[in-house]
């Protein structure tokens, strides 16, 4: 992702560590998860500083939620406990030294499917506001240049055969997003401390909806 300093720094760290391994034998194993989450962290495509609650709040209020492009880019989300299965298989594994591994769910879904799953869990209609990624990247409030234009607006598909081979752990039954998301949503709804108001994001969503509507005229 050339748009995001966070991603460029991670790539630079990998290069540094692998070079040190080649030079001195420094024991390094690189692990690349994909959008790992738990009950306290719900993956959505676009959110503000307060996290996913503001998105759930909009959906429950019958408001539209911003979605980059047409919502059909592919994404992969992995629960922390599923990630841990293969991660533990790499710990102390000499065959993993000097290697890099993906550890991700085998389920690849679109962002439309993500939001429809959330709508079904909440018992509401899915009301997207499709916004071009380049337009979101113009935001002065959020760094959507890196996280959307260079990241979540693009499709990703991962091959986990390497980590299965090296750990000796076969395919596991990864938690489907609809199941993991339900667990997260129920946690959010039952824990008031997770329900953080985010008026800046709400105002941003309303503004983006107005701008997007004007572009369609």
Predicted ranges, named:
Residues 34-49, 69-81, 107:
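Glycine-rich "substrate-gating" loop/helix at the edge of Rossmann-like oxidoreductase active sites
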Residues 89-149, 160, 165-166, 175, ...:
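Mid/C-terminal beta-alpha module of Rossmann-like enzyme folds, strongest
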Residues 24, 36-54, 90-101, 124-125:
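Glycine/proline-rich active-site loop of Rossmann-fold NAD(P)-dependent oxidoreductases
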Residues 54-78, 90:
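A conserved pocket-lining segment of Rossmann-fold NAD(P)-dependent short-chain dehydrogenase/reductase
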Residues 1-30, 39:
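Active-site Tyr-X1-5-Lys
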Residues 30, 71, 76-84, 100, ...:
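Conserved loop-to-helix N-cap of the C-terminal "lid" that shapes the substrate pocket in Rossmann-like
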Residues 74, 152-155:
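Glycine/small-residue-rich pyrophosphate-binding loop that anchors the diphosphate of NDP-sugar donors
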């Amino acid at each position: 992702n050339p748009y995001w300093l966070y991603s460029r720094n991670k790539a630079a760290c990998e290069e540094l560590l692998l070079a040190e391994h080649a030079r001195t034998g420094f024991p390094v194993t690189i692990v690349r998860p994909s959008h790992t989450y738990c009950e306290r962290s719900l993956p959505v495509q676009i959110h503000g500083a307060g996290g996913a609650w503001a998105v759930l709040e909009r959906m429950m209020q019958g408001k539209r939620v911003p979605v980059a492009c047409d919502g059909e880019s592919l994404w992969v989300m992995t629960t922390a406990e599923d990630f841990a299965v293969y991660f533990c298989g790499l710990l102390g594994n000499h065959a993993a030294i000097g290697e890099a591994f993906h550890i991700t769910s085998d389920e690849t879904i679109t962002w439309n499917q993500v939001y429809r799953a959330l709508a079904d869990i909440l018992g509401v209609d899915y009301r997207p506001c499709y916004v071009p990624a380049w337009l979101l990247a113009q935001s002065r409030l959020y760094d959507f240049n890196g996280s959307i234009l260079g990241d979540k607006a693009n499709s990703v598909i991962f091959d986990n055969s390497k980590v299965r081979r090296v750990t000796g752990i076969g395919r596991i039954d990864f938690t489907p997003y609809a199941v993991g998301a339900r667990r997260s949503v129920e946690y959010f709804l039952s824990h008031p401390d997770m329900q953080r108001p985010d008026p800046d994001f709400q105002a941003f969503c309303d503004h983006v909806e107005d701008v997007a509507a004007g572009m369609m005229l």
